[in-house]
Amino acid sequence: MKCRIDDNKKVVLGDYDIRGVIFDIDGVLLDSLGIWKDLGARYLIRQGKEPEIGLSETLFSMSMEEGTRYLKEHYLPDLSETKISEGLENMLRDFYYYEVWAKPGAEALLKACRDAGLRVTAATSSPRSHIERALYRNGLLGYIERIYTNAEVGFSKHSPEIYDRAAAGMGFEREQVCVLEDSLYALKTAAAAGYYTVGVYDENGEPDQKRLEETADIYVRELQDLLKLIQ
């Protein structure tokens, strides 16, 4: 789909007059999805335990509370769920604070959005403190006007509420905002609500890339591909 920037510094994608962008963070701006698959195994190895084959897949679909309970019941009966949860949270924090890197092309894309006159916000399921520290360390935080988290909004991305809050904060209607997501369920939520959507590939992300591509208005394997639409 062709993109142009008109005389009023608005990005026009086909019939869409795009004024603002909402970025997901994990798997879109940050190369962080791997930790969510490996966290349980990393923790068990630190505890001197050998993780089972397929543990990452088992835990990936669980909430933090469910995963903690699973690790206690199957590996660490002598540790309390609170102790296990604290250990997992500490490892997760350290990863975001000191290890995670931006995805290739993230800063260039954010800069291009800013230079095109687009308003930029972010919507994430991760803790604010982790995300802000990781974005700051990678030089990305300054490009984002405001970050919205599921915990603070009170809804998961199965609801469009987090996108609606971000759009309202920018002063735009849904059809004036583009949402970038790497997960199918979140992208489907945004699309059903009337947002323009971009599906982003991540090797540790959505297993059904075919449906992600079919659902999105635009699908890219690399963030750099979007620069061709903006520059």
Predicted regions and their residues:
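Conserved SAM-binding loop
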Residues: L29, V120, V179-L180
